[in-house]
Amino acid sequence: MAKPSHSSYVLQQLNNQREWGFLCDCCIAIDDIYFQAHKAVLAACSSYFRMFFMNHQHSTAQLNLSNMKISAECFDLILQFMYLGKIMTAPSSFEQFKVAMNYLQLYNVPDCLEDIQDADCSSSKCSSSASSKQNSKMIFGVRMYEDTVARNGNEANRWCAEPSSTVNTPHNREADEESLQLGNFPEPLFDVCKKSSVSKLSTPKERVSRRFGRSFTCDSCGFGFSCEKLLDEHVLTCTNRHLYQNTRSYHRIVDIRDGKDSNIKAEFGEKDSSKTFSAQTDKYRGDTSQAADDSASTTGSRKSSTVESEIASEEKSRAAERKRIIIKMEPEDIPTDELKDFNIIKVTDKDCNESTDNDELEDEPEEPFYRYYVEEDVSIKKSGRKTLKPRMSVSADERGGLENMRPPNNSSPVQEDAENASCELCGLTITEEDLSSHYLAKHIENICACGKCGQILVKGRQLQEHAQRCGEPQDLTMNGLGNTEEKMDLEENPDEQSEIRDMFVEMLDDFRDNHYQINSIQKKQLFKHSACPFRCPNCGQRFETENLVVEHMSSCLDQDMFKSAIMEENERDHRRKHFCNLCGKGFYQRCHLREHYTVHTKEKQFVCQTCGKQFLRERQLRLHNDMHKGMARYVCSICDQGNFRKHDHVRHMISHLSAGETICQVCFQIFPNNEQLEQHMDVHLYTCGICGAKFNLRKDMRSHYNAKHLKRT
């Protein structure tokens, strides 16, 4: 026979766990208010959450509903209705509450407020029996298990083991100490107290671990910790303490002011700073055994005479422990003593040089550092040759300045000015990253895109200059020169480029013969492309000699001419009337062209009205809206499971296949073998109406028709 109150009791337990945040696996944020809940409960009550968790299984730790027009008050009441089937307080607007429930697609939406009140009355009867059994302690919303036999026994066992949580005045405390004497307890109660004190008070850590399945648990709030140090730090700031702790703290402060606790200060002075913090806290916490030893000095020989005196001394020690507070003392900071245990290492410039990329390069500070300048030696044949010769020695300060100027990563004022570029059409100063977007948004009729590199340029002189430079080789020798006039001279005189390359090779030889001795360093560390200095201007491929470049360029130009001939054959489809001004791509409809512009601007202009998420494509937004509505595009014909994406649906259909079966990825029809699938695939091919050629894609069939049959007719 099923118990009618079991379901309501389980829901009550889940609601308690939700309030504690225990085992909650999702967090719902509405503005700046966060609600913790369980995915299983949300998916069982709401179709919206069920579909959302199905499609976002790996990224649903936190869900933001701030853009869904649901207030935090309504969602709090919805959570109460999900967990309990009722609401504790009436909403300010029931219509708004009902709209929020319909928006979240709850399975059971009440028609009026009286339905929830009736459900409240009926469920209170069921939950009353369950709540009557919840007199035991609950940790994180979970009721602790207790043995019914032990619970029906003497309550004195629990009274002796657990400290009282009431506030005791000094008069009541004296009366309690007098009531703990030997004559006030019956004989059976002594045995119970003795057993409980031996089993629980002797080892409080074991008592805590048996009560909750962890090592150290706070007796006030029930939070568990993995080590005792964390428990000690938590006890000092626990906000769920009993009321009697404030009273005992007050008496403790009074005793300290009166000078009664001078022995505690002496104990702190005897402590060595080398001992660990856990040992200090064990010393000052005052275990029951230590409290018993302190109380034994006051009781005298009565402690060792009888068992009854032991019980009385233990109870007195418990009363004394209530007066005691935990004092956390930190050892004095003595940096000079602590630094004795550390080895101080001095970092020199040599260590810094060894930590760089060129580990094999060793600097010798005793040798001078020379500047090199270019000198032209004119021979008999009047052929100019540029060599590197030392001009003058450089001091250490100048040498450091030169080395700081060498790395290309160091930013200069010129580079900082280059980051902010100005628009050539309107003069607006913006960053280079936003310059392309500015041209597309404001001056789209005056700009165009380069056909080789795709860079956005202004029509006119800028386009002509870029067309001349685009595709030309750019070596490190060009980048190394700081003057633009020298760059133009080198472009006009290509013979000097080879001479400068020879100059860099000779510079490497001079470095090898001089004081630095960099024999182990390859040439490519200082000049990356010195082994292959010649480069093809069309494809960018590098060669060692000039003859190889000439031979390669003849074949490379022929290939380009062949490609251009193919491009002339494939003319534009005249049915595409909407073309992009930047890249020249054509479209059948204007909306497709407007959507294509987002490829250049990278602007997500399609925004979801429900959650505010932005998308680059309109079809992505349509698919996202279907997820909000719970409308699946693909439905399994076997198990009726819905999927929003095609590849997810294909992957699900594959799970239904048996050995040897295959599936058509177009219509999702299952076939027993591959032969029948190949015969079936002819149905999905696009056939040319003139020659009968078949293609997998429609665009392939259209391009075939335009290339082969459009000109003939």
From Swiss-Prot:
Recorded GO MF terms: DNA-binding transcription repressor activity, RNA polymerase II-specific; K63-linked polyubiquitin modification-dependent protein binding; protein heterodimerization activity; protein homodimerization activity; RNA polymerase II cis-regulatory region sequence-specific DNA binding; zinc ion binding
Residue stretches of biased makeup (Polar residues): 275-308
GO cellular component, one term: nuclear body
Keyword vocabulary terms for this entry: Differentiation, DNA damage, DNA repair, DNA-binding, Immunity, Innate immunity, Isopeptide bond, Metal-binding, Nucleus, Phosphoprotein, Repeat, Repressor, Transcription, Transcription regulation, Ubl conjugation, Zinc, Zinc-finger
Biological processes, Gene Ontology terms: B cell differentiation; cellular response to UV; chromatin remodeling; DNA damage response; DNA repair; innate immune response; mRNA transcription by RNA polymerase II; negative regulation of transcription by RNA polymerase II
Location(s) in or outside the cell: Nucleus; Nucleus, Nucleoplasm
Phosphothreonine modification, residue list: T356
Domain of life according to the entry: Eukaryota
Zinc finger intervals, C2H2-type: 216-242, 448-470, 578-600, 606-628, 634-656, 662-684, 686-709
Cross-link for Glycyl lysine isopeptide (Lys-Gly) (interchain with G-Cter in SUMO2), residue positions: 3, 200, 205, 260, 265, 275, 283, 303, 316, 328, 340, 346, 381, 528, 563
Domain writeup: Both the BTB domain and C2H2-type motifs are necessary for transcriptional repression activity. The BTB domain is also necessary for oligomerization and efficient sumoylation. The hydrophobic cluster preceding Lys-328 enhanced sumoylation efficiency. The UBZ-type zinc finger domain is required for targeting ZBTB1 to UV damage sites and for PCNA monoubiquitination. UBZ-type zinc finger domain mediates binding to 'Lys-63'-linked polyubiquitin chains (in vitro).
Protein name: Zinc finger and BTB domain-containing protein 1
Gene: ZBTB1
